[in-house]
Each structure stands twice: as structure tokens, then as C-alpha cells.
Amino acid sequence: MNNKLRNEKLEEALENDSTEKENLEFETDEENEKDNKKLEQEQFRVKMLKLFGIVIIGLVVVLGLGFIISLFSKKEYTYVEVEDIMKDAAISYFEEYPKKLPATTDESLEVSTSILIDNKNMKEIDHYLNGKSCKGNVTVDKISSNEYAYTPYLKCGNDYETTTFYNAIKNEKNLVTSGYGLYSYNGEYVYRGKNVDNYARFSDSKRLFRIVKVNKDNEVVLIQDESSDNEYPWDDRYNKVYDDNSGINDYKNSKISDILSYYYKGKIGLENDDKYNYYEYSKEVKFLTKEDRTKIVKFKNCVGRRSENDTSKDGSVECSSTYDSEIGLLPVYDFLNASIDPNCITTVSPSCQNYNYLSDGDSTWFANGSGSETNEVYSMYLGYIANTEASETNNIRPIIHLSEKAMLEKGKGTKNNPYVIR
């Protein structure tokens, strides 16, 4: 009995010993597995750090090589960029020597690139154009007491020559003799028809203009594409003939000429101005920037009175009286010439609205008064010209004249790709 009991206890002890041994082995395996996982994770982290380091070093090497290459390689500038460099160089030169600037608005002078190079205002032209042989100069014109226009001219053999805006428009490839387009007409180059590619804008503005014509002085006449935000009276002075304030159709002393002056200066709808302020009108979109104004010239706006039955289209009637200004309104004859309808004969022919890009849009004022009634002026009404009492209100589409020195930067004349003036 005792032997049996001892055997059972021995077997139980051996069994417990075996179980403890198995548990110990299991715990050891589990710890080893954890250690292996930690080791694998650490090895993976080290590999990723090495890979990340290699990528960073590679980027640094590539960027460093690019920088070193850039130090030893020249940038090739475009011709337009070189013209801008010439212009900036001339501005710097005359900041150093202001007494050399033109003294009057009638005076114009040229400064050659060789002078600008000698004065360290710019480098040799071939530096910018990788050895191309070019010559150039910058013309300086006085615009007002403190404003000057700087116009660069660059010629590089047969490869490139600065293009003036008027020459680009007058190019023979643009001319047509029928249909819509640019006509040689009465000694001028006139856009006629409905769908014509005569859109233009200044390089620093999105405001669109339409090219009306290139006149005999090579000034490009532009009219604002969209009409003004506000409606304005042409004139609302007391008229003795009618004993009321229906206005007088004398442009030189009219309210509209004064309004246009404010419009040109961007002073319509401002809070603190003495007139045409925000109590009367909403603020108009800025007409021209300071830089844009250096590219336009004062012109003789043709403001003579015209009768309803007048059939002339050469401007002789309207231009019998002129008003000098930087901004004006379209003369009637320019509207008539824009139509290619053969039935557009007199001032008020309804057919003049046909095949005429100028007939679109709001009712707008023209520059000319009626030849028969002193309180009536011409406006575009429903697409054609009609007599309107001067004290009525209409929108305006101002005109300006580009200097013959204004340049073409790019563009095709379409609404989406207009000619760009610089």
C-alpha cells in the first residue's frame, strides 16, 4: 500500500515537472518570437532610414548640379524681353540724368543702346540673345509734366524687328476688298462688317477695345468694347430757344465732355469728389492705367453738327469743328463707314445697323449734334442712329487714339486672343 502510494506521488511529481518544463519552453519560444519581431522591425527601420537618406542625398546632388549648370549657362531671352530690358535701362539712365529728358511735349529724343551699355544700365545685346547681332535705341517722349513714354526699337538683321501697332494692323495680309474685314477706305484703314477680328487690349489690363481704324497720321483709333456702367446726359444746360433744361448740342461746352474727362481720370463714382460722385453714379471700372496713358495721344475729336439727311462719309462735316482731348466719343461718319450695307446712305438710315460690329450693345452717345435742333444730339438707338434730346441719359463708349509709337506684343485680334498693345 505504501509502495503504491509512493509510486503515485512519484508519477504526479514527474507529470508536474514535465508540465512546468513545457510551459517554460513555450514561454521561451514566445520571448524569442517577440525578440525576432523587434529585430526585424529595427532592421526595417534602419533600411528605410538608409533609403530616405539616399533619396535626400540624390535630390541635393541633382539640385546642386542644376544650380552649378545654371551658373555657367546663359538664359536666352525673347526679343520682347530684351526690348523691356532696353526700356528699363533707359528709365534708369534718365533717372541719373533727368536734365537730358525732353523739355516739352513737342520734343522727342533717342538714346542708343551703346550709351546705355557704356553707362552700365544694361549689358551688350548679344549677351541676352546668345551672340545674335542686333542694334537698338529707345525713344523718349514727354507726355505731361511728370510723365514720359519710353519706346524701345530693336533690329536683329532679318530675324526680328520691333513691330509698331499701326504697321501690324496695316499689313497687306489683313486687307480685304469685300465681305467683313479691314478696308483701305478714304485714305484710312477701316474695319467694316459684323464679325471682324479687331479686338485689342493693353498689356497690363483686361479691358477690351475694338479697333475702328488707322487714320492718316498712323494713329490707331480704339473704342471701348463694352459700354459704361452708368448712363449720362449729353448736356442738360438751360436752352433759351426751348426755355428749358433740354441741353445745348455744343460739344466743346457740353456736360458730356466734362464727364469724359472725369471718366478718363477714373474719378466717376468716388466718395469725396466734387461732382459725378457716388451720390449720382456708381464707380466705373478703371479706364486706363498710368502706363496705358503713355501710349495714347491727344487728338482732334470731330464734333461738328450734322443733318439727318447728310450722305457724306469722309468726315468733312463732323471734322469742320474739333475738340482737342485724350478721350472722346465716336463721330457719326465712323459708325456709317463700319456698315457694308449699300443702303446705309444717310445719317439716320436704319440699314446702317446691318453688317456693322458697332451696332451691338446698349444705347450710346455719339460726338455730334443735330444740324437742325440745338437741343438734339445723335445716339445709337436699337442699333442705328437716331436724334435724341441732349438731356436724356445714355451709356458711353469712349474712343482714344494710340500713338504711332505704340507696339504690338502679340495676338490675333479675336475676342479670346486680342491684339496686345505695349
Where are these regions (language model features)?
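Long, compositionally biased
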Residues: 137-160
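Substrate-binding/catalytic groove segments of enzymes
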Residues: 96-101, 120-127, 374-377, 405-409
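Conserved hydrophobic/amphipathic alpha-helical signal-anchor segments
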Residues: 73-109
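Sec-dependent signal peptide cleavage junction
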Residues: 65-80, 414, 418-422
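N-terminal targeting leaders characterized by basic, low-complexity, disordered sequences
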Residues: 1-38
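N-terminal Sec-pathway targeting helices
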Residues: 42-58, 68-71
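Collagenous Gly-X-Y triple-helix signature in extracellular proteins
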Residues: 160-422
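Extracellular/periplasmic head regions of type IV pilus-like filament subunits
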Residues: 102-139, 298, 320
